[in-house]
Swiss-Prot record:
Residues binding ATP: 51, 90, 499, 536
UniProt source species: Thermosynechococcus vestitus (strain NIES-2133 / IAM M-273 / BP-1)
Binding residues annotated for substrate, in chain numbering: 93-96, 115, 239, 311-313, 539
An MF annotation (GO) of this entry: phosphoribosylformylglycinamidine synthase activity
Homology family: Belongs to the FGAMS family.
Role of this protein: Part of the phosphoribosylformylglycinamidine synthase complex involved in the purines biosynthetic pathway. Catalyzes the ATP-dependent conversion of formylglycinamide ribonucleotide (FGAR) and glutamine to yield formylglycinamidine ribonucleotide (FGAM) and glutamate. The FGAM synthase complex is composed of three subunits. PurQ produces an ammonia molecule by converting glutamine to glutamate. PurL transfers the ammonia molecule to FGAR to form FGAM in an ATP-dependent manner.
UniProt cross-references to NCBIfam families, sorted A to Z: FGAM_synth_II, PRK01213.1
Protein name, as recorded: Phosphoribosylformylglycinamidine synthase subunit PurL
Oligomeric form and interacting partners: Monomer. Part of the FGAM synthase complex composed of 1 PurL, 1 PurQ and 2 PurS subunits.
Pathway(s) this gene product operates in, as recorded in its UniProt entry: Purine metabolism; IMP biosynthesis via de novo pathway; 5-amino-1-(5-phospho-D-ribosyl)imidazole from N(2)-formyl-N(1)-(5-phospho-D-ribosyl)glycinamide: step 1/2
Any one of the GO CC terms: cytoplasm
EC number of this enzyme: 6.3.5.3
């Protein structure tokens, strides 16, 4: 083997490898790698595949719990729902591909996350997505939104999996680097959970699914780099998906897993054949010999480098029980899919690649998949300058706006991040499979029926990214708390988390400070709320290079996907008022809380950003003890049948939450603010903070409800008013009975429904 370099410095750099990493590769191999081997290391040592900058931080996440069956390290996490039911779930990002080719980038993001689910032996039952875009007034943003939403809709609708929920936010920081995070859930259909560790020396290795082409070349390395003008034309790095092939692949895989002939399975996602062979071999402590001449192709003249790095979609790798490969091949051929023996499990712990009868690459499996670089960076002790400057702002510097409270409420409802997302979710089929009980826009979380039982599951994705930007630690806590609160608002007990960490470069002090502190906040909140992390995704280098050559990172955006269990589907509520005469209560921090209390703040609020054009101040601190108690009271009230509706207070504070419940229920509300409230009406109506939920309760339940609330939440519940009738108005009066807001449902509706169609139709 060669002792002189077989590749150029330019080729090393093009693979995303640093000089010291190349030196380490040479040391590990005892020789210089050839071009194919360099490509294998390039993708497997990318941040996207090996988490070299984040793995040490992820170790602080709690990963075990009484319901956790599979934690981090497999294709998806799995939790026990009781009665023999098991739920697989996972979130993944497809940010960089979606920036380049929005339709295919988003579509293949959906396809990839679905494969993670059914590779475990679970049938996909639901999809959610968390999307971030730039300023909606910009033509480029409009093009991205249309492409991404169409791609998600196309793939999910064609494959027959409902898209049941998600979130969409707009901020200029995402202009050049949108975020497309897709989450999927599935119910286990196989007796045993299908794992990915190869075993059984001599067992055949099967390639199943679609053919291999040059699409998606080096996608994992591409996903670990900053976006530049050059990379924006890098379309070969974007995969092309076929949802109809994926649908056949789902059915064929689930049928194959039922036979017991599959020893291990791995989907070919990022890094394609390289990742699937090296991960399966490394996890099993064995090796895999792969013959590229047997791989089904869709393009001629492909060389080993292209075979190994292709990210063509809808492909899987199996290890089969020896002698049973024909049985599996028959199943896949019956579904119209490729199925070929392309290799075997070997005792030497290597990935050995054959091409035209010769060894084209030979690399220790653990060097690619387990013993990858790990960077321990020093986290700055002092917050960066932008945070220190933001913390100097105080509410005393803020003049009361000249506009009326009603005008400001309507303005906030018309901001794209708060406005109705019906334009988005009406393109998704959220009813296919006929198990969706709470539709997008109707509740704080999606609810899916578990057929044959009285149970349901709820799911949500959340991240207050402006909070995380201003205070990553509190923002990380807030992301977990809001996800759990949203589940609690439909009556679900939060079970577990899958996280998607979208950040800028960890190689800058600011970037690493944001990442490290957000992880600390996420970990603390997950422990406090008893929602272990079962896996997830890290997407770093979400930056665009501006015209001056300077990287412009996104807001740090750790999206929390959370699942919950509903014991009785008869006890599920939405966010809209249900009946005239129902009393309206605020759970959590009372409106008499002084603005000096750090748990309530205009800092980092939607009001401050949209009305005053300021991103400043300290976001609200999360009181995890109060959060637990408020959520538990809300869940119990729903389970007892006392609560008719529940909605958490998030962007826009009290006034926006009241308006959203009016809009969802198409009923008005009469609100009388209690005595002793703070004097600033803007803070009273629009300040934000955790652990706050609006609930409505029918008259016949109010005595029992109030007794329970007082016992469990003394001084942390407030009766605010009453639901006042269909198609009426939202009336909010101050404590001295002077009217603050009088807005009809029609006015609210017009402001809230118009923004997205205005820019996107």
């Amino acid at each position: 083997m060669s002792q002189t370099p077989l590749v150029t410095e330019a080729e090393i750099t093009a693979e995303g490898l640093k000089p010291q990493e190349y030196t380490e590769i040479v040391r590990r191999l005892g020789r210089h790698p050839n071009r194919a081997e360099l490509g294998m290391f390039g993708v497997m040592w990318s941040e996207h595949c090996c988490y070299k900058n984040s793995r040490l931080l992820l170790k602080q996440f709690p990963t075990q719990g009484p319901r956790v069956l599979v934690g981090p390290g497999e294709n998806a996490g799995v939790v026990d729902l009781g009665d023999g039911l098991r739920l697989a779930f996972k979130i993944e990002s497809h940010n960089h591909p979606s920036a380049i080719e929005p339709f295919q980038g988003a579509a293949t993001g959906v396809g990839g996350i679905l494969r993670d689910i059914f590779t475990m032996g679970a049938r996909p039952i639901a999809l959610l997505n968390a999307l971030r875009f730039g300023d909606l007034k910009e033509a480029k943003t409009q093009q991205l939104v249309k492409g991404v939403v169409a791609g998600i809709a196309h793939y999910g609708n064609c494959v027959g999996v409902p898209t049941v929920g998600g979130e969409v936010y707009f901020d200029p920081c995402y202009a050049g680097n949108p975020l497309v995070n897709a989450m999927a859930l599935g119910l286990m259909e196989t007796p045993e959970i299908v794992k990915s560790a190869a075993s059984g020396i001599g067992n055949p290795v099967l390639y199943v699914g679609s053919t291999t082409g040059r699409d998606g070349m080096g996608g994992a390395s591409f996903a670990s780099a900053e976006l530049t003008d050059e990379s924006m034309s890098d379309r070969p790095a974007v995969q092309v998906g076929d949802p109809f092939v994926e649908k056949c692949l789902i059915e064929a895989c689930l049928e194959a897993f039922q036979t017991g002939a599959v020893v291990a399975a791995q989907d070919m996602g990022a890094a394609g054949l390289t990742c699937s062979t090296s991960e399966m071999a490394a996890k099993g402590g064995v090796g895999i010999e792969l013959d590229l001449d047997k791989v089904p192709v869709r393009e001629q003249g492909m060389v080993p480098y292209e075979f190994l790095l292709s990210e063509s979609q809808e492909r899987m790798l199996f290890v089969a029980a020896q002698g049973r490969e024909a049985e599996l091949i028959e199943i896949f051929q019956r579904w119209g899919l490729q199925a070929v023996v392309v290799g075997r499990v070997i005792a030497e712990p290597l990935v050995r690649v054959l091409y035209r009868g010769e060894v084209a690459a030979e690399v220790p499996a653990r060097a690619l998949a387990e013993e990858t670089p790990l960077y321990e960076r020093e986290c700055p002790k002092e917050p960066p300058a932008y945070v220190q400057q933001a913390r100097q702002w105080s509410v005393d510097q803020l003049p009361l706006p000249a506009r009326s409270p009603a005008e400001i409420l309507l303005t906030l409802l018309a901001t794209p991040s708060i406005a109705s997302k019906a334009w988005v979710y009406r393109q998704y089929d959220h009813e296919v499979q006929n198990n969706t009980l709470v539709f997008p826009g109707d509740g704080d979380a999606a609810v899916i029926r578990l057929r044959g039982t009285a149970k349901g599951i709820a799911a949500t994705v959340d991240c207050p990214s402006r909070y995380v930007y201003l205070d990553p630690y509190e923002g990380g806590k807030a992301a977990v708390a809001e996800a759990a609160r949203n589940l609690s608002c439909v009556g679900a007990e939060p079970l577990a988390v899958t996280d998607n960490l979208n950040f800028g470069s960890p190689e800058t002090p600011v970037g690493y400070w944001q990442l490290a502190n957000a992880c600390r906040g996420l970990a603390e909140a997950c422990r406090a709320l008893q929602t272990p992390v079962t896996g997830g995704n890290v997407s770093l280098y979400n930056e665009t290079i501006d015209s001056n050559g300077q990287p412009q990172p996104i807001y740090p955006t750790p999206v929390v996907g959370m699942v919950g269990l509903i014991a009785d589907l008869q006890r599920v509520v939405g966010q809209g008022w249900r009946a005239t005469g129902d009393a309206i209560y605020l759970l959590g921090l009372p409106l008499t809380t002084p603005l000096s209390d750090p748990r309530l703040s205009l800092g980092g609020s939607e009001y401050l950003a949209q009305i005053h054009g300021l991103v400043a101040g300290c976001p609200p601190q999360i009181d995890l003890d109060l959060e637990q108690r408020v959520q538990a009271v809300c869940r119990y009230g729903i389970q007892q049948g006392w609560i008719a509706s529940a909605h958490d207070l998030s962007e826009g504070g009290l006034a926006v939450a009241l308006a959203e419940s009016c809009l969802s229920g198409q009923r008005g509300a009469t609100i009388q603010l209690p005595e002793g409230t703070y004097p600033r009406w803007d803070a009273l109506l629009f300040a934000e903070g955790g652990a706050r939920i609006l609930v409505s309760v029918p008259p016949r339940e109010q005595v029992a409800w109030e007794a329970y609330a007082q016992a469990q939440l003394p001084n942390a519940w407030t009766r605010l008013g009453v639901v006042n009738g269909e198609d009426t108005e939202l009336c909010i009066d101050s404590c001295n009975n002077s009217p603050l807001i009088r807005v009809t449902i029609k006015e609210l509706d017009l402001a809230w429904r118009s923004p997205l169609p205005k820019y996107l139709d």
